Each structure stands twice: as structure tokens, then as C-alpha cells.
Swiss-Prot record:
Keywords, comma-separated and alphabetical: Sporulation
InterPro entries in the record: Spore_Cse60
Pfam families referenced in this protein's UniProt entry, alphabetically: Spore_Cse60
Organism from which the protein derives: Bacillus subtilis (strain 168)
Example GO biological process: sporulation resulting in formation of a cellular spore
Induction details: Transcription starts around hour 2 of sporulation and requires sigma-E.
Name the record gives this protein: Sporulation protein cse60
Length: 60
């Protein structure tokens, strides 16, 4: 069965930590693909906001 896990963090290091923790729980044979994206925006006060996201496709 194919499954997905979605991760979304405000900081790259937090995303890295979450993904590494998840990957410890599956084997290399189960991992199919990882998709990664970054979004950036400004709030009304001009502060930059970032969203680091990853989708992991794996076999259960």
C-alpha cells in the first residue's frame, strides 16, 4: 500500500529534524520519493514568512 507523509515547518532545520525522525522509522526499500518546496510571503508589517514543506511517498 502506498502512503504519504506531509511535513511543514517555518525553519529548514526543523523540517530536516522532522524528516530524519520519520525516515528512521522506515527502511530504504519503503522510501519511494521526497518532494520539497519553499514558499515565501510578507505579512502586512513587511516581515518575511517562510514555509518549508516536504511530502514523502513511501510503501507501507
Amino acid at each position: 500500500m502506498l502512503k504519504v507523509a506531509v511535513f511543514d515547518e517555518e525553519h529548514e532545520k526543523d523540517l530536516q529534524t522532522e524528516i530524519n525522525s520519520f525516515l528512521k522509522g522506515i527502511s530504504e526499500e519503503q522510501l519511494i520519493d521526497i518532494k520539497y518546496t519553499v514558499s515565501a510571503a510578507c505579512d502586512p508589517d513587511g516581515e518575511q514568512l517562510y514555509c518549508f514543506s516536504a511530502l514523502i511517498l513511501y510503501r507501507k
